[in-house]
Amino acid sequence: MAAGPSMWVGSVYLYIKSDTVPLPGKYTHQKALIYEALRSAISESTRGCRDSIEILKIHSSDQQLILYLKFCGLEPCQRFLKDYKECKVQMQIQNKLKNCFSVEGLPIFTELKIDTGEIDSLLEKEEQCLKYISQMKPTIQKDDELAEIDERLKSIKLDSPSALDSELSLQNSCQCSLPLSLHSNRSYHIEGSTFHFQGEEFVDRPLTSAHIQHFAKSVGKNWKPVGRSLGKTCRALNDTAIENLAYEFDRDGRYEQAYQLLRLFKDSEGKKATVQRLVQALEENGLNSIALDLLSLNENGLK
């Protein structure tokens, strides 16, 4: 849902954890099914206001799923906070996931956070919560894969539950059976897009986790200049954002700073966060050897 110039917009992170079911692992293999369950559970709070709460991205950590939620409108956010405070959101998520996994019980634990901290302890102070959520404007577009799932589900007649269940089952069986290299690059290949570097022609493709990890391991103190070069064509990588990354991950070292830089680039640009753009930024800063290493990586991350 596109926000108008005067529309109230904000975002928040919703952390979901279960001690009985490994949610990150399940999500990897049942992405469409779990995404639809979470989307359905969260939309219960909108009371008919379609697209007023949107899941922009789902991150996986070791033990939990982290949903990046966008609110379009003050009232939907107020209703969500009210339902969350009364544990209705948690119960909806629990029930939907329980049905997904066909288990009798599925206790879950949730937590709301913004960039500067958690919100659960402030739920009695609604105005303060709304202020913090409003201040955290969404900085990324919807994840390409989630948008693709949305489009597929829209094409199904929602008044036919059997058709929806059949489609979700098919999607998940395909996700489980595809080889990792095929699954991870499904629909991402840029047909016919090539570029030249040091006299050789290369096929462009979106950045993978292997590219990000190799960059973070190799770039060292030059991560900031590369970030500024990328920032010329990526609004999310402005000087303030780069300095915030430097400060926030200072204790974690340059690897983590560089890693988070490319994660932000990829999250904000989606499919447009390509190898070519990173290679150009590296070349601009005289880091041709790193660029060549990245170009030599296979899809499995090996040279």
From Swiss-Prot:
SUPFAM superfamilies reported in the protein's UniProt record: DEATH domain, TRADD, N-terminal domain
Record domain Death: where: 208-298
Main location: nucleus
Alphabetized SMART domains for the sequence: DEATH
One GO process term, biological-process aspect: extrinsic apoptotic signaling pathway
Annotated InterPro entries: DEATH-like_dom_sf, Death_dom, TRADD, TRADD_N, TRADD_N_sf
Domain of life: Eukaryota
Keyword Nucleus: yes
Cysteines engaged in disulfide bonds, as pairs: none
Any Pfam family: TRADD_N
PROSITE patterns registered for this protein in UniProt: DEATH_DOMAIN (PS50017)
Protein localization: Nucleus; Cytoplasm; Cytoplasm, Cytoskeleton
Keyword Cell inner membrane attached: no
Residue window of motif Nuclear export signal: 141-157
GO cellular component: cytoplasm; cytoskeleton; nucleus; tumor necrosis factor receptor superfamily complex
Record GO terms (molecular function): transmembrane receptor protein tyrosine kinase adaptor activity
Motif (Nuclear localization signal): 224-237
Key words of the record: Apoptosis, Cytoplasm, Cytoskeleton, Nucleus
Quaternary structure (record): Heterodimer with tnfrsf1a.
Domain topic, free-text comment: Requires the intact death domain to associate with tnfrsf1a.
Purpose: Adapter molecule for tnfrsf1a that specifically associates with the cytoplasmic domain of activated tnfrsf1a mediating its interaction with fadd.
Protein name: Tumor necrosis factor receptor type 1-associated DEATH domain protein
